Amino acid sequence: MTINLDKIKIPDDWKQLLASEFLSPYFADIKTHYLNALQNKEMIYPKPHQIFAAFNLTPLSSLKVVILGQDPYHGSGIIEGVETPQAMGLSFSVPRGMPIPPSLKNIYAELSQSLHITPPTHGDLSGWARQGVLLLNAILSVRANAPASHKHFGWEYFSDGVIRALSAHKEHLVFMLWGNYAKKKAPLIDASKHKIITAPHPSPLARGFVGSNVFLQANIYLQEHAKEPIAWEKL
């Protein structure tokens, strides 16, 4: 199977915002690495048509919040008898029918504690994406069962470019940076016109995410700037 990343559709407004990224030498390198991996018969997650799912589900015009993840889930599970990747192109999200990963369970625990939201029974965060939450991974692909295996592709140049472009061309966005890796992206963001909310990573290996009030803080900021808050319970 081969795939041309240029042929994967994303909305025109995102294409225009990120035109210089897609035309850059580093993105040509990403495409070469990706094509080589496919030609080498690597099992790659998420599926090719879902690589840019975050941009397809979240209209640029209604963008309010960016939640930065690091690496796509590298595992899979069985849904209705079919082996299915955990990764679906949205940070922290897994398809309906997939067991909820530990980090997402902690995200739900924080929602329960701070906003009294009953934890969903699934891990599909598409409902957030459609409300204007960009669920962006810093690295957009991974080889099955091999975490960070595509780090050398150069995806982080792309995700850094996305963050810079949003910081420069949008106003009053909330950037959620959870964990030390994400916090290092703060210098890419103009804090004079955006809200940066940091917290420990929601992984059970870290402590302090539950009780951080990150979702409450985000909605307070949005309302202060005449924006509709995110209905975090709508999933």
From Swiss-Prot:
Under Gene Ontology molecular function, one entry of this record is:
uracil DNA N-glycosylase activity
Among SUPFAM superfamilies, the record links this protein to: Uracil-DNA glycosylase-like
Chief subcellular location: cytoplasm
Active site feature: D71 (proton acceptor)
Query: EC number(s)?
Result: 3.2.2.27
Q: Which keywords belong to this entry? A: Cytoplasm, DNA damage, DNA repair, Hydrolase
What gene, per UniProt, encodes this protein? Answer: ung
Q: Which domain of life is it from?
A: Bacteria
Extract the CDD domains matched here. UDG-F1-like
Sorted alphabetically, which InterPro entries does this protein's record hold?
UDG_fam1, Ura-DNA_Glyclase_AS, Uracil-DNA_glycosylase-like, Uracil-DNA_glycosylase-like_sf
Would the keyword DNA repair turn up in this protein's UniProt record? yes
Per the record, the similarity remark reads: Belongs to the uracil-DNA glycosylase (UDG) superfamily. UNG family.
Catalyses which reaction(s): Hydrolyzes single-stranded DNA or mismatched double-stranded DNA and polynucleotides, releasing free uracil
Lineage per the UniProt record: Bacteria, Pseudomonadati, Campylobacterota, Epsilonproteobacteria, Campylobacterales
Keyword DNA damage attributed: yes
Show the Gene3D superfamilies listed in the entry.
Uracil-DNA glycosylase-like domain
What PANTHER family does the database record attribute to this sequence?
Answer: URACIL-DNA GLYCOSYLASE
UniProt-listed PROSITE patterns: U_DNA_GLYCOSYLASE
Compartments, as annotated in UniProt:
Cytoplasm
- Any idea what this protein is called? Uracil-DNA glycosylase
Name the HAMAP family for this protein. Answer: UDG (MF_00148)
> NCBIfam families in the record, alphabetically?
PRK05254.1-1, PRK05254.1-2, PRK05254.1-5, ung
